[in-house]
């Protein structure tokens, strides 16, 4: 997948509470799966304790499992990388990616996210 190995951008996003925050304030330091639509292939990651978040476009409503890409930076980046779902490492680099035609690979055998949750920045 063309996104693998790249450092993801750090734009402003809208969190579940409707606050404008840096993307890293939400996912920084934790494994996270991000997707642009369906997260069907992310089930194995979720079972391993990894949060799964949808990236919604500008003007969308935020939610518990959805962040809003304020200016479309993340969505454009994913489109440029020809991917719709990624597994993001704690350091912000893309570990794995997928598309509807090539689903996101599962985590490595035995992988479990330790005390992994999206940051509570309230």
Set out the residue ranges of the language-model regions.
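Helical substrate-recognition/capping region of FAD-dependent monooxygenase/halogenase enzymes
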Residues: 1-122
